[in-house]
Amino acid sequence: MKKKLPFTIIHKNNNIDLFFNLHPETKDKEIVGKVAEELINNIDKQLKEYSTISDGDLIQSLAIVIATRIHISPFDNTKMINLMNQLIKNGLVDINNGKISKIGMA
């Protein structure tokens, strides 16, 4: 049975209900969800503080963090990069399959 992580985001007056398909070797989906939520909330906080940051600069910042994390992990860097690319692709598919509901005045 595939592990799925229910997740909700609010973006531009839309409530988006998602179900992320997790990697088969995911050890604890609750922790994955909590860490993802904390990271998203922290990014939102940073975006408010640095309101002039571009999407490109934000993505570059995230790439630096991910590259650093991959480098210090005990796994083969190339395999980790391939896994990361696949997880991103799968995550985008899951987001595109999310259920969108308008919030407030539509």
Residues of each region from the PLM?
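Solvent-exposed interaction surfaces and binding hotspots enriched for charged
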Residues: M1-A106
